[in-house]
Amino acid sequence: VAKSKQTTARKKMLEKLNVEEIRPSSRKYPGIIFSMEREPGNQILEVQDLKAVDTDGTVLFDKVNFNIEKGQKTVFLSRNPKAMTALFEIINGNRSAEAGTYNWGITITTAYLPLDNTAFFDSELNLVDWLSQYGPGNEVAMKGFLGRMLFKQEEVEKKVNVLSGGEKMRCMIARMQLQNANCLILDTPTNHLDLESIQAFNNNLVAFKGNIIFSSHDHEFIETVANRIIELTPNGTIDKLMNYDEYIHDEQIKAHRERMYS
């Protein structure tokens, strides 16, 4: 009897649905696929005794030592968000460290998504010409690439210096895909992205076979992508092979963090 009532209720519910409600979703997801041209070796990145200081004299981090191993997707955390940007700028050769060294493995190729992408868009180039700077391919191929990143046909002639924050971020992600790197460096990558773009980005990073070094404010993004956590402090690092939820709820780590920042 209960089953018969359920069936009747479901039938009534279906009858109430109009065509508007059962239309396919109009949400569009960009085609984000990172692929590696070269398989990485076992030595990815070694950092020794690295130190960075802000322009006002604040120590962002000090005594930073770590060795990134093959297959690791490492999120960097800090109470001072400038610490992660400083680290990423240093290992990309854009900034000098106050002390310490870093060495990339000889098989490693990197693609970097910086926090501030302003300098990339300071030109009168249209989207097709802009993207063509970063990879092989003719105009048709570049238009196809931009189409997968949800740029409409009429938008690809737009000048890059008038793009919105979200459009710039989609261009930067397209640029990274053309680089076919085996190590991705991402400084707060979900900034300016809509939910669909974040989901597409997230899914591809989970599937990516290379290494990822990143920072993010997005809890779900960190939880699903990272398999290693390194926290940068003025007194060294906290370095754990665990997921994000475990890390933030571990009482011993909480106590350790307080000591490291004091």
Spans of features found by a protein language model:
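ABC ATP-binding cassette signature C-motif
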Residues: 37-262
